[in-house]
């Protein structure tokens, strides 16, 4: 009798995706973050569902309802902080996952990569709208500043902003629709994740060498299920350490003050995972230019397949590009730091230089280094 997992219409799909899936024998721990992102998404959907049971999307009661969750609901504080810090873990895993794809040339799987970029945008939109829901000072002013950026769009800008607000300022209508979108988007993300995996399983996984691994495949289970389990345990350990010991480490103290349209906080800034993009936005003195730079800072990822000049797929054997890659990582850390600083000297010039470096490395220096390395390789043979 044939095994049920190979014959049953539904179980067969799971079998081909997670059990009998042929995987390269040499993929490293950098390949663990895909499954960790799946775990983060599940944690966020489950904790978010329980939070939504007690939350009220109304300007008068939103802040109080979050307080009520933390004080009166059984383990409400745990659910709330798991959701807030779970978002941070989500973005840490996302950045590593994207960074891995850049380093090892995974972007040559065009469909998988482009859906990944779309997923990144969707997750960022979801996180932004979620940050507005507690209706603290930073929630309100963050929403005001970021939605206001759309007014930079010529001709339709102002109308568009007021349409999104549902009025002449961020108010009840805005909060209600943000809650609706914040609730529905994770399910859209889940659907996109399935498509992401569907395209990935058409080609099979990449590996650190960037070479074809068809000749040396191993089954996903038990080898990578047990390897993923280690990653899962480490992620949960790290998340629970944050939640139970330092729940407010990554948050803004201003968000513990109820939203007040008459009182602007001294420094309006988003959550830490948006600071690099926020720094790029602020580094350009022109409003429309800043918005375009902000969008391009993420959309540039979609250009990577077209900017690849090397004959080698991975950076594993390309020391010049490797050096540029790690300079880019350091540059992103500088941008993250600058995004959290006030707009004054010397932070303005540092932010501008870091923004120029960011685009220069990806658009100019990396493609050039790919050509140079190919030449060096040709001469050495």
Curated annotation (Swiss-Prot):
Keyword terms of this UniProt record: Electron transport, Heme, Iron, Membrane, Metal-binding, Mitochondrion, Mitochondrion inner membrane, Respiratory chain, Transmembrane, Transmembrane helix, Transport, Ubiquinone
Keyword Glycosyltransferase: no
Membrane protein topology class: Multi-pass membrane protein
Record text on cofactor binding: Binds 2 heme b groups non-covalently.
Gene Ontology MF annotations: metal ion binding; ubiquinol-cytochrome-c reductase activity
Protein residues bound to a ubiquinone: 201
Chief location bin: mitochondrion
GO cellular-component term (any): respiratory chain complex III
Residues binding heme b b562: 83, 182
PROSITE patterns: CYTB_CTER (PS51003), CYTB_NTER (PS51002)
Positions that bind heme b b566: 97, 196
TM stretches of this protein: 33-53, 77-98, 113-133, 178-198, 226-246, 288-308, 320-340, 347-367
GO terms for biological process, alphabetical: mitochondrial electron transport, ubiquinol to cytochrome c
Cystine connections: none
Gene3D superfamilies: Cytochrome Bc1 Complex, Chain C (1.20.810.10)
Function: Component of the ubiquinol-cytochrome c reductase complex (complex III or cytochrome b-c1 complex) that is part of the mitochondrial respiratory chain. The b-c1 complex mediates electron transfer from ubiquinol to cytochrome c. Contributes to the generation of a proton gradient across the mitochondrial membrane that is then used for ATP synthesis.
Additional observations: Heme 1 (or BL or b562) is low-potential and absorbs at about 562 nm, and heme 2 (or BH or b566) is high-potential and absorbs at about 566 nm.
Family: Belongs to the cytochrome b family.
The protein, known as: Cytochrome b
Species assigned in the record: Chrotomys sibuyanensis (Sibuyan striped shrew rat)
